[in-house]
């Protein structure tokens, strides 16, 4: 029901949702503003299964540099959420991204497991190991990035009260998103671009992916259209840190339930349905 209401709100051009306090919101999903600003965010997922595919030669790379090139060429700011396994695999890239003022880096756990289950088919992270998932990646960000934001995005956007406390106790602000870019496994850049552009509203946080490969093959080629069309509509691109200076909009209700639709084409689902469950192996 929440997803349906979100879709209707986007279609009808409803006004931004009422603001809520930091204490009331489980995540920062978007800013309550009438200003045409939007934050593009990109997750660099890496599960143990993805790492095995890389080492076994099944996948050439889990770093889609064309995503970064598209952003740089168009001077579009972005916030990048990196998993610890991804940082360990691409330490030089992490350093380069951290040094680029166009970007800011955040924490996306160490191994991209579920902090709350069921969460699609992501493998569960036991409660006793969740703090280490956050801290290990924090240590890696310190080592390879130096400069980073204390922002955390839950894998699959799945969490519960205990997981939230674990993350917040380590000094992190939890970041979600109100627009699922639906680029996971989608092969059509035009479809990804059209989906994002049609749902963006002032203060939106768009969730996309930067690991490429078979899991997110269309993202880089969708970005030129996304950036060009949103700028034509008067939008400018900001980082999550810019949105956090504004009041928070009402949180988006992200379903934390298992769904087995791997046999369905990605583009049959609404824009607000997340596909991160495909990444768990």
Regions found by a protein language model. Name each.
Residues 20-106, 111-117, 138-143, 148:
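Active-site beta->alpha N-cap acidic-glycine motif
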Residues 1-62, 94-95, 225-229, 233-281:
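N-terminal pre-catalytic segment of deacetylase/amide-hydrolase enzymes
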Residues 68-82, 104, 122-158, 165, ...:
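CE4/NodB-like, metal-dependent polysaccharide N-deacetylase domain
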Residues 48, 58-59, 82-91, 153-160, ...:
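Acidic-and-aromatic substrate-binding clefts and catalytic sites of carbohydrate-active enzymes
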Residues 148, 163-200, 235-246:
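His/Asp/Glu-enriched short active-site or ligand-binding loop at hydrolase and phosphoryl-transfer sites
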Residues 101, 187-189, 196-210, 215-218, ...:
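Accessory recognition modules or surfaces
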Residues 42-44, 82-84, 107-109, 154-156, ...:
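A cross-domain feature marking catalytic cores of carbohydrate-active enzymes
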Residues 37, 62-66, 89-92, 129-132, ...:
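Extracytoplasmic/secreted proteins, especially bacterial periplasmic and envelope-associated proteins
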């Amino acid at each position: 029901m929440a997803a349906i209401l979100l879709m209707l709100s986007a279609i009808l051009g409803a006004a931004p949702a009422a603001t809520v306090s930091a204490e009331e919101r489980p995540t920062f999903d978007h800013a309550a503003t009438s200003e045409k600003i939007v934050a593009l965010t990109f997750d660099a997922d890496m599960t143990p299964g993805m790492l095995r595919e890389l080492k076994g030669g099944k996948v050439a790379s889990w770093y889609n540099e064309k995503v970064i090139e598209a952003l740089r060429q168009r001077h579009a700011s972005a916030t990048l959420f990196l998993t610890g396994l991804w940082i360990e695999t691409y330490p030089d890239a992490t350093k380069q991204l951290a040094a680029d003022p166009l970007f800011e880096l955040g924490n996306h756990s160490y191994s991209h497991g579920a902090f709350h289950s069921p969460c699609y088919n992501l493998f569960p992270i036991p409660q006793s190991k969740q703090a280490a998932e956050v801290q290990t990646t924090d240590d890696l960000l310190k080592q390879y990035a130096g400069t980073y934001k204390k922002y955390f995005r839950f894998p699959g956007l799945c969490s519960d009260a205990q997981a939230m406390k674990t993350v917040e106790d380590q000094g992190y602000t939890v970041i979600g998103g109100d627009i699922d870019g639906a680029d996971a496994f989608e092969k059509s850049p035009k479809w990804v671009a059209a989906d994002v552009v049609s749902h963006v509203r002032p203060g939106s946080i768009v969730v996309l992916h930067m690991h490429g490969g078979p899991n997110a093959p269309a993202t880089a080629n969708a970005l030129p259209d996304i950036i060009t069309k949103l700028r034509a509509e008067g939008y400018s691109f900001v980082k999550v840190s810019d949105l956090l200076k504004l009041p928070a909009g009402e949180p988006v209700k992200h379903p934390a339930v298992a769904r087995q639709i791997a046999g369905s084409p990605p583009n049959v689902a609404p824009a607000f349905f997340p596909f991160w469950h495909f990444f768990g192996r």
